[in-house]
Amino acid sequence: VMYGVVDFYKACKEAGIKPIIGCEVYVAPRGRTRFQKVHEFDSSFHHLVLLCRNEEGYRNLSYMVSQAFLEGFYIKPRIDLELLRAHAKGLIALSACLAGEIPRRLRNGEYDNAKAYALTLSEIFGPDRFYLELQNHGIREQAVVNKGLLRIHEETGLPLVCTNDAHYLTKADAYAHDVLLCIQTGKTVDDENRMR
C-alpha cells in the first residue's frame, strides 16, 4: 500500500532527506484478475520491491498498486508480469527478501528457474534497473539464497544490492510489530511457532 506516501515525502523534505518512494508488491504466479483465480494455484504470491526513479515511475507504481486492489485482490492485492511489462518505466526493481520469487526458487533448489526469472525481470525493467537483493539476517536459508544470487550475478552480470528486511523503525517497535503479525496470522504472542 502507498497510503503514507505524501506524509513520508513531506517529512523527508522537512528533514533535508531525499525521499525514495517505493512499495513491496505481491506478484501473482499466474494472471491477477478475478477470472484467473484457482485456489490451488493462486493462493500463493511472492514479493518484489519497486522504487520510483522519477514522476513517471511514481505514476506507474500508483497505477499498479491501484490495479492490485481493483483487479488482483485474492487474499492479498496482487500484480502480475503483464502489468509490470506495461508499467515498468521509471521504476527500479529489487528481487526482494526470502519471500521473493527468485529466493523462493533458490531455496527449493531450482537454480535454473531462478536465473530464468531474474532474466525475465531484467528484460522487463532493463539491466540497469533490476537488482539482485542480498540480505544477511543470520538465517540459514539466506546463506543458500545469497550463494545462488551471487552465482546468477557472476553468470549474467545482473547488479547486486545489499539491503535489510526492515519492518519497523526502532527496536522499541518490535513488540507492536509482533502483535500485528499475530493478529494477521491468528496467533498469540505466547505461541512459540508464530511468525516473527
Residues covered by each model-derived region:
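Phosphodiester-processing cores and adjacent nucleic acid-binding clamps
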Residues: 1-196
